[in-house]
């Protein structure tokens, strides 16, 4: 039986989120609805999640000393990493000492903090199907990897980045240096290491939200949400929809792959497993041990959205992954580089039938920064996609003055 306390009292159940962007914000809201005392941590002040949490803290989360000091001072019951750029070795140390429980585990946080750890786990340890790949530390190594078998076209990504930053496709020799430079500029940390992957001519790509939660038997059980289809531009999610139609054999394979990788990572919580699909063939791409940006569509489609599923799972509560309605999401970009933007056209966006708008509250806008998302419901996915994109297009961020 799970016992939950009262926030801001000695009995409080305290959860600390490391990373407080738009995904963390929704997790915090879900936790608060269950009476959890929340601590939102980010590298800058007034991050979206900090605006709704009981406590807001700003530190360099990649600094192990700052991270250790904060966790020891706040004494949370759970620490929930929501981004990759965290001093994960310190989390492993604190978890091993019994200081705190890391979600899903400190090992999972370390392995998934960069593309190398998780790719080697999936392909080399678990034997899961992936694209051909090489890791490279220099432009010369990148060229040698391409010439040595990866070939063209191929995709280059920093080993550590988020939301597709630094990712590009190379169609021929003339694009190699530009791809390397772009990867160096887009990485989360300044070490020059990339993964280059052979290009898979897939039909579509999906996110399979996979939940490890306590079952009725008292044991951890794995459940799957309906597959989410999505469109990415330069590795950054632009729109998503649920459900994505799949051949039954492909769905079975996708679930088997997701089960294998999440079981190895262990712990409890929601995982976003990214997969490429061609006919009945499925390839593993990446996994995040936390809610996924493409999964924001579940705020329109599921009885329990991905954030509620994550909150319930990490607290040891039962979950329900049932689909409620077909739906879609479409990103609202900043469009301008400015502080404290205003949003025109929200009324026009909400006049599109069966739509909702979520504005994240980010204090600073960039042209390609995700500032909000439009959600739409419908009887079918195609109609929902049309509605979501139309609603998103009507929201117009602008600089003040």
From Swiss-Prot:
Gene3D superfamilies in alphabetical order: 3.40.50.20, ATP-grasp fold, A domain, ATP-grasp fold, B domain
Q: Indicate which residues the UniProt annotation says bind Mg(2+).
A: 274, 286
Its Enzyme Commission number(s) read: 6.3.1.21
What do the Gene Ontology cellular component annotations say?
Answer: cytosol
**Signal peptide segment:** none
- Residues the entry annotates as binding N(1)-(5-phospho-beta-D-ribosyl)glycinamide: 22-23, 82, 293, 362, 369-370
One biological-process term from Gene Ontology? 'de novo' IMP biosynthetic process
Under the heading Pfam families, the entry gives:
ATP-grasp (PF02222), PurT_C (PF21244), RS_preATP-grasp-like (PF22660)
Which portions of this protein are annotated as coiled-coil regions? none
Protein task = Involved in the de novo purine biosynthesis. Catalyzes the transfer of formate to 5-phospho-ribosyl-glycinamide (GAR), producing 5-phospho-ribosyl-N-formylglycinamide (FGAR). Formate is provided by PurU via hydrolysis of 10-formyl-tetrahydrofolate.
Q: Which HAMAP family match?
A: PurT
Subunit-structure text: Homodimer.
The protein, known as = Formate-dependent phosphoribosylglycinamide formyltransferase
The protein's organism comes out as Cupriavidus necator (strain ATCC 17699 / DSM 428 / KCTC 22496 / NCIMB 10442 / H16 / Stanier 337)
């Amino acid at each position: 039986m799970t016992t939950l306390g009262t926030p801001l009292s000695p009995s409080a159940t305290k959860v600390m989120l490391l990373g407080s962007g738009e995904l963390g914000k929704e997790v915090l809201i879900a936790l608060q609805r269950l009476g959890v005392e929340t601590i939102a941590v980010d590298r800058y002040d007034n991050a979206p999640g900090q605006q709704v949490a009981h406590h807001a803290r700003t530190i360099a989360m990649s600094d192990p000393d700052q991270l250790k000091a904060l966790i020891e001072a706040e004494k949370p019951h759970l620490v929930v990493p929501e981004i990759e750029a965290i001093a994960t070795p310190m989390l492993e140390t604190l978890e091993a000492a019994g200081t705190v429980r890391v979600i899903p585990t400190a090992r999972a946080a370390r392995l998934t903090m960069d593309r190398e750890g998780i790719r080697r786990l999936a392909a080399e340890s678990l034997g899961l199907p992936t694209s051909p790949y090489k890791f490279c530390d220099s432009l010369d190594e990148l060229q040698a990897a391409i010439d040595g078998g990866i070939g063209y076209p191929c995709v280059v990504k920093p080993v550590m980045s988020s939301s597709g930053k630094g990712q590009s496709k190379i169609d021929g020799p003339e694009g190699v240096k530009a791809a390397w430079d772009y990867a160096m500029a887009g990485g989360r940390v300044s070490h020059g290491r990339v993964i280059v992957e052979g290009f898979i001519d897939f039909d579509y790509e999906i996110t399979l939200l996979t939940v490890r939660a306590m079952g009725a038997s008292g044991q951890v059980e794995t459940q799957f949400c309906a597959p989410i289809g999505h469109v990415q531009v330069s590795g950054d999610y632009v729109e998503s929809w649920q459900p994505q139609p799949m051949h039954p054999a492909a769905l079975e394979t996708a679930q088997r792959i997701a089960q294998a990788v999440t079981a190895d990572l262990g712990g409890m919580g929601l995982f976003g497993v990214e997969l490429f699909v061609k006919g009945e063939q499925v390839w593993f791409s990446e996994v995040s041990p936390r809610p996924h940006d493409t999964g924001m569509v579940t705020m329109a489609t599921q009885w329990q959205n991905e954030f509620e599923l994550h909150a319930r799972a990490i607290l040891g509560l039962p979950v329900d992954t049932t689909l409620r309605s077909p739906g879609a999401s479409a990103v609202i970009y900043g469009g301008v580089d400015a502080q404290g933007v205003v949003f025109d056209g929200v009324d026009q966006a909400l006049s599109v039938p069966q739509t909702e708008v979520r504005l994240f509250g980010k204090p600073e806008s960039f042209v390609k920064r995700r500032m909000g998302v439009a959600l739409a419901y419908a009887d079918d996915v195609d109609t929902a996609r049309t509605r979501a994109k139309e609603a998103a297009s009507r929201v117009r961020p602008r600089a003040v003055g």
